[in-house]
């Protein structure tokens, strides 16, 4: 394998540029899964666990299973969409690239119906909130993914609420195309400038462990004490000379969690 140079990474940003007529949007939609009889969050193993849920989803909908140490940790279909697993068993739809929000709405609706059809057989249900409203950190179940074990050990070293972020939060994210470096900068700056407004508009997590938390968005509060090396608003984004190279320089100075070699996550 040839040595990777800085310019190779900048070229990767350049390779993502697309003409306006080819622009797409991609949505990531997370939700908590719980047992209907007890409202407890669902663990990976055992009866009506996340493993059984993923395997049934794959069988009934002809999705391909993605395995790690013989455990099903994600699914994907022929369109480019996937269902992945967050640290505490939150399920995430990573939608395929689509042309508009109407298509995204349809995709999400079909996904939720697919989920409900299988969950009803297992006595499970789901809810889309920014923060688990009922259960404590110690009540959560860790999913059997190698990189989460590394992050689990790292998070307490850099913040007080990183494990809560991993186990007790959900979100909806959007991925956008860009046609040039300047277009990327423009979209990046606007999205960061509007982040607080978006948080206020869609705040829906006022409870922690069954009590009012004092926040309309407990999820947003958690991110203030997670890992300052990779959270918050990077001031560099609003620099007059901000672009691919300066963003890359910022990324390269962020401490790494791990590297991935020959199918394994290696703690560094």
Question: Where do the PLM segments sit?
Answer:
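Loop-rich catalytic cores of soluble enzymes, especially ATP-dependent carboxylate-amine ligases
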Residues: 131-268
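Terminal catalytic/cofactor-binding subdomain
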Residues: 1-159, 168
């Amino acid at each position: 394998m040839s040595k990777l140079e800085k310019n190779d990474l900048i070229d990767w940003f350049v390779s993502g540029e697309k003409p306006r007529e080819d622009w797409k949007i991609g949505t990531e939609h997370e939700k908590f899964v719980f047992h209907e009889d007890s409202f407890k969050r669902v663990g990976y193993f055992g009866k009506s666990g996340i493993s059984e849920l993923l395997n049934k989803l794959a069988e009934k909908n002809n999705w391909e299973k993605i395995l790690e140490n013989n455990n099903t940790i994600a699914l994907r279909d022929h369109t480019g969409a996937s269902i992945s697993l967050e640290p505490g068993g939150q399920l995430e739809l990573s939608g395929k690239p689509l042309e508009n929000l109407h298509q995204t709405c349809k995709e999400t609706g079909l996904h939720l119906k697919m989920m409900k059809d299988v969950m009803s057989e297992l006595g499970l249900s789901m809810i889309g909130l920014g923060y688990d409203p009922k259960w404590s950190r110690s009540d959560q179940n860790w999913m059997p993914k190698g990189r989460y074990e590394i992050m689990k050990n790292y998070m307490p070293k850099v913040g007080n609420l990183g494990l809560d972020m991993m186990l007790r939060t959900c979100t909806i994210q959007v991925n956008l195309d860009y046609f040039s470096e300047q277009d990327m900068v423009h979209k990046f700056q606007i999205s960061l400038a509007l982040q607080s407004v978006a948080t206020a508009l869609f705040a829906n997590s006022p409870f922690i462990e069954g009590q009012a938390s004092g926040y309309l968005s407990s999820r947003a509060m958690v991110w203030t004490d997670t890992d300052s090396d990779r959270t918050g608003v990077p001031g560099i984004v609003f620099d007059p000379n901000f672009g691919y190279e300066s963003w890359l320089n910022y990324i390269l100075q962020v401490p790494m969690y791990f590297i991935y070699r020959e199918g394994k996550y290696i703690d560094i």
